[in-house]
């Protein structure tokens, strides 16, 4: 019986959305968005992250001003308990995603390990 890998992927999507970790992440994200101060700080934090990533991807140097802004924004974010909670929930979700990725990659790793033996 052939397996439709895309059906499995959609089942995984649904399963992820039903995990306590994802539900907690949704709740934490909603709390940040419902608080104007936390929302503004979080959006600024994300904007700075994107700016740094874009510079890295295009080979641009990250100047001192960008570093200073990033440090200031990071400090502000660390002082906001709603954002700290959100980041903790993101980390828990990231652990799950990394575990899933490891599992998904196992067939390829097994293939190449067998081929190298």
Swiss-Prot record:
It comes from the Bacteria. InterPro entries: Com_YlbF, YheA/YmcA-like_dom_sf. Gene3D superfamilies: YheA/YmcA-like. Pfam families: Com_YlbF. HAMAP family: UPF0342. Belongs to the UPF0342 family. This is UPF0342 protein lmo2223. It comes from Listeria monocytogenes serovar 1/2a (strain ATCC BAA-679 / EGD-e).
